[in-house]
A protein has these predicted regions:
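Aromatic-anchored glycine-rich loop motif in surface-exposed flexible loops
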Residues: 1-87, 106
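An aromatic- and glycine-enriched ligand-binding surface/loop that stacks and positions planar moieties
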Residues: 33-35, 62, 69-73, 89-193
């Protein structure tokens, strides 16, 4: 039997895998060709580092992503059950919200999936108290406590301390010199000097 933290961690793993595969599937998949999808639980004797199988259709990808989000939902707590230090972690409503997004993309190939979208949005509103903010001010308030309101679904919160310009180490800014103030790659041509 899994401990509570192991169960939640497994739920987060399912959530993250589904999310990552969705990012590839909707960009590169079509009704005639899906994208590779690795399900480690399908490797009975362990992962053998072979090339992951490509799905026959993006619809097959969407089915696997929905399955991952279902598995995540079963293992994740509700948003309301998190302490302040855990806000930003995946939770049940976030898994359902991603299912909504997947079904909306799936509806491009099968219009009957809009019914699933409506059903799941209704579940988000009624069972999980997600919905639109009561006032416009709640969306753009400087009071950060309002950030976790009923419109909140899921984010990866920052830890602060950044200058807002992205990573300070591998960044490439178009500056025509070597390692300068902007850490650009530039043209860096050798000379006889």
């Amino acid at each position: 039997a899994l401990t509570e933290i192991e169960n939640r961690s497994l739920g987060e793993a399912y959530f993250t895998r589904g999310w990552a595969h969705f990012l590839m599937a909707y960009r590169y998949g079509t009704d005639k060709q899906g994208v590779p999808f690795v399900r480690y639980e399908d490797f009975v004797n362990g992962y053998d580092n072979s090339i992951p199988p490509q799905q026959a259709s993006v619809i097959d990808n969407y089915k696997l992503i929905i399955e991952d989000m279902e598995n995540a939902k079963k293992r994740l707590p509700r948003f309301e059950d998190y302490d302040d230090k855990d806000l930003g972690r995946a939770h049940q409503a976030a898994a359902i919200a991603f299912q909504v997004k997947v079904y909306a993309y799936w509806a491009m190939w099968d219009e009957t999936k809009w019914d699933e979208v409506i059903k799941l949005v209704d579940e988000l509103e009624t069972t999980y108290n997600r919905g639109l903010a009561d006032t416009f001010d709640e969306l753009f308030s400087s009071d950060f406590s309002k950030y976790w309101g009923k419109e909140y679904l899921w984010t990866i919160p920052g830890t602060g301390g950044s200058t807002g310009g992205g990573s300070e180490f591998p960044g490439v800014i178009l500056e025509n010199k070597g390692w300068g103030i902007y850490n650009g790659w530039g043209q860096i041509k050798p000379t006889y000097d």
